[in-house]
């Protein structure tokens, strides 16, 4: 018990990075940018039918945080899962992969 170690300023950040869990990354198309600092992204998920084996396309719409309002409708974007930013926002815009024409 006499041996106590004090954490330096650099150690908590390193420990925090190890504690933080896996965060999902998704690609999708922006379908709405009418809100301030928020975009709606349609994400496609491909699943195999359990009985017949056919690959099905399932889409879901998620709200993502766009701090600088740079994404527009039709852009292909990369989003990452993040802490809850509002009642419905759990994703953050990482980068715009392809601008709409």
UniProtKB/Swiss-Prot annotation:
Disulfide bond entries: none
Record-linked SUPFAM superfamilies: Nucleic acid-binding proteins (SSF50249)
GO molecular function, one term: structural constituent of ribosome
CDD domains registered for this protein in UniProt: Ribosomal_uS17
Described purpose of this protein according to its UniProt entry: One of the primary rRNA binding proteins, it binds specifically to the 5'-end of 16S ribosomal RNA.
The protein's assembly and partners: Part of the 30S ribosomal subunit.
Family, per entry: Belongs to the universal ribosomal protein uS17 family.
Protein name, UniProt field: Small ribosomal subunit protein uS17
Organism ancestry: Bacteria, Bacillati, Actinomycetota, Actinomycetes, Micrococcales
